């Protein structure tokens, strides 16, 4: 694992960390048993197969 040669200041550490941003999951419409739901794209197949309870929120 890489280790730093010199100590990084608190300001530099925080400005580096602030560049990492969480992105919002894109919701895709899916119709299951005649009802329309919006789910994240990565859960689309599981929603169609009935592995996810879409009525519970």
UniProtKB/Swiss-Prot annotation:
InterPro entries: Ribosomal_bL32, Ribosomal_zn-bd. GO terms for molecular function: structural constituent of ribosome. It holds the Pfam family Ribosomal_L32p. One of its GO terms (biological process) is translation. Residues 1-19 have a biased composition (Basic residues). HAMAP family: Ribosomal_bL32 (MF_00340). Belongs to the bacterial ribosomal protein bL32 family. This is Large ribosomal subunit protein bL32.
């Amino acid at each position: 694992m890489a280790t730093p040669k010199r100590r990084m200041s608190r300001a530099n550490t925080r400005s580096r960390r602030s560049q990492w941003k969480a992105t919002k999951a894109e919701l895709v419409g899916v119709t299951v048993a005649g009802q329309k739901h919006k789910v994240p794209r990565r859960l689309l197949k599981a929603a169609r197969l009935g592995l996810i309870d879409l009525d519970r929120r």
